[in-house]
Regions:
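Short N-terminal segments immediately surrounding and downstream of signal-peptide cleavage
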Residues: 1-9
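A cross-family detector of function-defining hotspots
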Residues: 9-116
């Protein structure tokens, strides 16, 4: 998923890019929708895509190059350990984090726009 195409989009705009959601639920002051075969999650705050969880990344190696699979340029992480690799210096995003899965792959990625 090219996350920058989805960031800041409305639910209707995200559906054009990702297809119709498999499900949506209202959670507090936000709306959480799941898209595609991996049930990638997009949380809409004030009708803008503010948080994205990308699933189904098991073909991606757990490392700084994982940003490529998200449509982002490779960058030096701000922190990295065996539990997560985090970037807080990507323009337009508050944080990008990838979490390890089995066999040194990425389990999932979390993207926070930070403008709630």
């Amino acid at each position: 998923m090219d996350v920058m195409q989805v960031v800041g989009k409305s639910e209707a705009e995200a559906s054009v890019l990702l297809g119709q959601p498999a499900s949506c639920a209202d959670i507090h002051r936000a709306r959480l929708c799941k898209y595609g075969p991996h049930e990638d999650e997009v949380m809409f705050v004030r009708d803008k895509a503010s948080m994205i969880t990308v699933q189904g990344m098991d073909a991606v190696a757990f490392g700084a190059d994982a940003l490529d699979a998200l449509g982002l340029a490779t960058a030096e992480p701000d922190s990295a350990d065996e539990h997560a690799i985090r970037w807080q210096s990507i323009p337009g995003l508050h944080e990008v984090a990838v979490f390890p899965g089995p066999g040194n792959s990425v389990d999932f990625a979390y993207i926070d726009v930070g403008k709630h």
